[in-house]
Amino acid sequence: MTTLVLIPGLASDAVVWRELADAAPLPSHAADLTRDASIAGMAQRLLAETEGRLVAIGHSMGGRVAMEMAHQAPQRLAGLVLANTGHQPRREGEQARRQRLIDLAHADIEQFADAWLPPMLDPARIGDAVLMAALRAMVRRAGAAVHERQIGALLGRPDAMAYIPAIACPILLIAAQQDGWSPIAQHREIAAAAPDAELAIIENAGHFAPLERPEEVTSAIMGWLDRRFGAEHA
């Protein structure tokens, strides 16, 4: 049976995909991205921790890990779900911007959360106390050291467009209307380059769409899983 590999993003954990894990008709494996210092290493570990055919479901940085899994072991990937992600290599000036956040996280993780999280969200959700508390708690659990290690992995990330055209498995891309960090255009570029991809756009959500709009994101993924793998879990 196919296993869903649920992959969180930067300074995140299994909470990102909790609603999907509870609803999914297939067994799932919660990925831990806290231990490796490269996207390739994260992908390699997840492939080693699992068996058989996989659908890798990644949010943000986790989407990059999912694509890398398909690059490393195409025979094992039955499908990919890529939410709020991107494909570009490191950009000019990115290292300095990231370093400022690394320094802030080491100085005060709460101040880091206050600086980093609001720009990631749909502006209408910044005042949502329950959502913000859940996100801040997740950042605290990750901590400054994990954040720094994961930033190092992101700064060394590959140009995924170099291998996206060779990913033969079906891909569901999930973009959010208010995501300024990973805009819809990036997802359209991935969809155009991949042999078999479709795009779902979530309204009233930013970069943390799986937590901002969990019902809508879960519904999009469940519908895609049913269309692509319905016979397997009927």
What is each model feature region?
Residues G58-G62, A66:
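Gly/Ala-rich beta-loop-alpha elbow adjacent to hydrolase catalytic centers
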Residues H71-Q72, R76-A113, P119-M120:
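Flexible "cap/lid" loop of the alpha/beta hydrolase fold
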Residues R90-G93, D108-A166:
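Conserved alpha/beta-hydrolase catalytic His-Asp/Glu region
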Residues I167, L173-A175, D179:
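Short beta-strand/loop motif that positions the catalytic acidic residue
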